[in-house]
Regions:
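General beta-strand recognition
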Residues: 79-81, 164, 200-202, 287, ...
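Polybasic (Lys/Arg-rich)
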Residues: 238-330
Length: 330
């Protein structure tokens, strides 16, 4: 039996019955699907509870008095529904889409999590969400322990404890191979980061200066230790670490002038923000002056434009990009 967290704050005189009436309204009603007292009584019988019309009506009034938005449509047989919820259908749909598209969450756990999210809007709207469900398992991770690892890492951060784990990669045969012959890492985790559809833990590794990051879906043999974690080094700039590690990676920072076709303005704004420095060149082109980390990611991003974006300055960056392009023709 699932019990909603909001039940904890209740101190109703007829306790159990009132709680299950609320549960019935949350699960089985919405503005388009109202329930009668007979429906509610039928629901109560599933839990070996029973009540007459007057008792159920009194319980609903008490629920309304403590703030639940329960609509009553009066007729010869009154009908009720839970009108307002903590999350709207659109809000839950956004959360469902995020879970659905996340490569980090395994397929089986994605379906389970989406089912729980669907309960937030009641059974009728929840079924609509489930019918629209599409999980592309090909792109999902196959590590079933991720949720447990996330929970333990979060606990380690709160309690300032170290974690231990081994880390795997894939060989040419697509087989999992432990890094460094099964070496066990010990990390003082500082923060969990979701970036580019992957989940990372960032922390302090041994006596290494600065922060280190590890993909959680590549961990195995995970252990939450009782060892006190290393205090976060205040002199280190975590925002600078994020900028270098999670943007265009660890290249040299440089101001670059790009010539772009107008249709790429959306991509430029997405990458650099609405305040990016741009200038109209002609009816079909604009220039963008941006600060980037010169790395394979940046050059790959320019290359992916298929000639619709060109590097104008500096000349040495332009030449370096051309050398990369020429290397593909060899």
């Amino acid at each position: 039996m699932k019990v909603y967290s909001c039940f904890i704050c209740f101190d109703m005189k007829n306790n159990k019955r009132s709680l299950f009436i609320l549960k019935c309204l949350m699960e089985q009603s919405d503005e388009k699907h109202l329930v009668t007292i007979a429906n509610i009584n039928e629901y109560l019988r599933q839990y070996d509870l029973d009540a007459n019309r007057e008792t159920i009506s009194d319980c609903i009034k008490e629920l309304q008095e403590v703030g639940y938005d329960i609509l009553c449509v009066r007729s010869t047989q009154n009908q009720y529904c839970m009108r307002e919820r903590s999350f709207s259908l659109a809000e839950v749909k956004l959360l469902v889409d995020a879970v659905q598209s996340s490569r980090f969450i395994p397929e089986e756990q994605s379906i389970e999590l989406i089912s729980k999210l669907a309960e937030l809007v009641g059974s009728h709207k929840g079924e609509i969400l489930k019918r629209q469900l599409y999980i592309e398992s090909r792109a999902k991770t196959d590590n079933p322990d991720i949720m447990e690892y996330v929970d333990k890492i979060h606990q380690a951060i709160i309690e300032n404890k170290k974690i231990k784990f081994r880390y795997f990669e894939y060989n040419a045969n697509k087989e999992k191979v432990l890094r460094y012959d099964g070496f066990t890492y010990t990390l003082s985790p500082c923060v969990l980061v979701w970036n580019n559809d992957m989940y990372y833990v960032v922390g302090i590794y041994k006596d290494k200066e600065g922060y280190s990051k590890f993909r959680i879906d590549r961990m195995c043999d995970f252990e939450l230790t009782e060892e006190k974690g290393t205090e976060s080094q205040e002199s280190l700039d975590m925002s600078d670490f994020f900028e270098k590690e999670f943007s265009m990676m660890n290249g040299e920072t440089c101001e670059v002038e790009l010539l772009c076709e107008n249709k790429l303005m959306g991509s430029i704004v997405d990458k650099f923000g609405i305040d990016v420095n741009t200038e109209i060149v002609d009816a079909e082109h604009f220039k963008a002056i941006v600060d980037v980390n010169l790395s394979g990611n940046f050059y790959g991003w320019v290359f992916a434009s298929k000639g619709k974006m060109k590097i104008l300055t500096p000349e040495w960056v332009k030449s370096e990009f051309q050398e990369i392009v020429n290397s593909y023709a060899k």
